[in-house]
Regions:
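Conserved donor-binding/catalytic core segment of Leloir-type glycosyltransferases
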Residues: 213-231, 237-241
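N-terminal subdomain of nucleotide-sugar transferases
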Residues: 1-68, 118, 240-243, 401-428
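Short hydrophobic beta-strand element within catalytic cores of glycosyltransferases
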Residues: 312-316
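Donor nucleotide-sugar binding/catalytic pocket of nucleotide-sugar-dependent glycosyltransferases
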Residues: 143-154, 161-206, 216, 223, ...
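Nucleotide-activated donor-binding/catalytic signature segment of Leloir-type glycosyltransferases, i.e.
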Residues: 257-282, 289
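Aromatic "clamp/platform" in nucleotide-sugar-dependent glycosyltransferases that forms part
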Residues: 295
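C-terminal amphipathic helix plus adjacent low-complexity
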Residues: 363, 368, 373-428
């Protein structure tokens, strides 16, 4: 079996959520099949500038084919197109122009997919909202499997995507909430399975090694990821500072990751910057609780890693996916206001027995659903199932409307469609 993993960026040093997801899946599927990665020469997700060399290289034993991006992203143009499709009645042509302006637009990548359709048994496309996934899925619909990595934002309200969701052979969902959201906007029951992603956790993390290396003695909560307002960090800083003004105790907040948002200059808040995987996992194992303040997630690998290490999670309950994961695992608490944040953090800080119980629950949940043998088996079983599927039972990709139909401004704003999508965690 030969599989092409198609993703917007790829590399050992590229750690975006979908890109890391794609790399992990590619490397693990390569143990069972012949895997090629098809990607662009972009390193930066804001500009899509061609910083990496076109051609073929090997990364961790997986062949990677890079294709140039035709043009960098222009933020002003993308913002104008986004305002049109998200906030105004518009046409399908407006949505296609938005997709082009978002990028990364690589005609060479799409030509390779079209001309090599017979070379691969399956094309595994990552991230439904990008140019390569939309046009690539249309080019090889009968071999297309989509990993949507969809978040609850206005993009899911665009009319261009339901035909793709209904027309690919299968979808590999990250969560029950993602599947429910996409099935609602597609107006159909979509073929696929909830799979998520595994993680390369150390067998024996050493919490004390982290404490000694970084001089940490007091109890602490930890945040791991990009320190950005879009990830909920501005609210996290406000809530945590209010909590330590109101509550007694010595719990610190430690931050691991690159900072886009300024970190408050406060004695109880400490930014460690970018650290090695060894230090990251030691830190997560040493923490009393991992805080996940993000409003938008399709899975949250960091929360799963915390549970895999036996650390409870405190999550933003306004993110349906995080709330659902906490409820299904019984490994964490969630909040939707400062008062709930303070009560939950106080309960976790003051009760080792609660932390231990939730940590055990989270670890059991991780081992049941997110170890790599489980993830690999779900992918391989899906490919085997699709290979056996009679051609008459396969979905077909609806063609794009004609010239004039594409230009009729009859589509509702993406934000309006999103407002009609049911919210809430899905309990299973």
């Amino acid at each position: 079996m030969r599989i092409a993993v198609v993703v917007q960026r790829y590399g050992a040093e590229i750690n975006g959520g979908a890109e890391l997801h794609a790399r992990y899946v590619a490397e693990h599927l390569a143990r069972h099949a012949e895997v090629d990665v098809l990607t662009t020469c972009a390193r930066d997700y804001v500009t899509w500038e061609n910083e990496l060399r076109a051609g073929v290289e090997s990364i961790n034993g997986v062949p990677v084919r890079r294709f140039p991006v035709a043009r960098p992203r222009t933020p002003e143009l993308f913002a104008r197109h986004s305002a049109t499709v998200f906030d105004q009645p518009h046409s399908l042509q407006d949505e296609l122009a938005w997709l082009d302006s978002e990028g990364p637009t690589s005609p060479a990548l799409l030509r390779y997919i079209e001309t090599n359709a017979g070379t691969y048994d399956w094309f595994l496309f990552f991230s439904y909202r990008y140019h390569h996934a939309y046009h690539g899925s249309r080019a090889v619909a009968k071999k297309a499997v989509l990993v949507p990595t969809a978040e609850r934002d206005a993009t899911v309200g665009l009319a261009m995507f339901p035909p793709i969701l209904r027309g690919v052979r299968a979808l590999m969902f990250n969560s029950f909430e993602e599947r429910a959201m996409l099935q609602h906007v597609a107006g159909a029951r979509l073929p696929g399975v909830i799979v998520g992603i595994g993680s390369e956790l150390p067998e024996r993390p050493q919490p004390e090694r982290f404490r000694q290396r970084f001089g940490v003695q007091d109890p602490f909560a930890i945040y791991v990821g990009r320190i950005d307002e879009n990830k909920g960090c501005k609210e996290l800083f406000a809530f945590f500072q209010q909590h330590i003004r109101n509550a007694r105790g010595r719990m610190q907040l430690l931050l691991i990751g690159n900072s886009i948002l300024p970190v408050p200059d406060h004695p109880m808040i400490r930014h460690l910057g970018f650290v090695s995987d060894e230090d990251k996992f030691d830190a997560m194992a040493a923490a009393d609780v991992l805080i996940m303040p993000s409003y938008y997630e399709s899975l949250s690998m960091v929360a799963l890693e915390a549970w895999g290490l036996g650390t409870p999670v405190l999550a933003n309950g306004r993110c349906d996916v995080l709330k659902g994961q906490c409820l299904r695992s019984n490994g964490g608490l969630f909040y939707e206001s400062y008062s709930e944040f303070g009560e939950a953090l106080g309960a976790l800080a003051s009760s080792p027995s609660i932390r231990r119980a939730m940590g055990r629950n989270g670890m059991a949940y991780f081992r049941r659903h997110y170890t790599w043998p489980v993830i690999e088996r779900k992918y391989l079983q899906m490919f085997e199932q699709l290979a056996r599927e009679p051609e008459g039972q396969q979905a077909s990709m609806a063609p794009l409307p004609g010239y004039f139909a594409r230009r009729k401004k009859v589509l509702p704003p993406g934000m309006k469609v999103l407002a009609g999508v049911p919210e809430g965690a899905v309990l299973q």
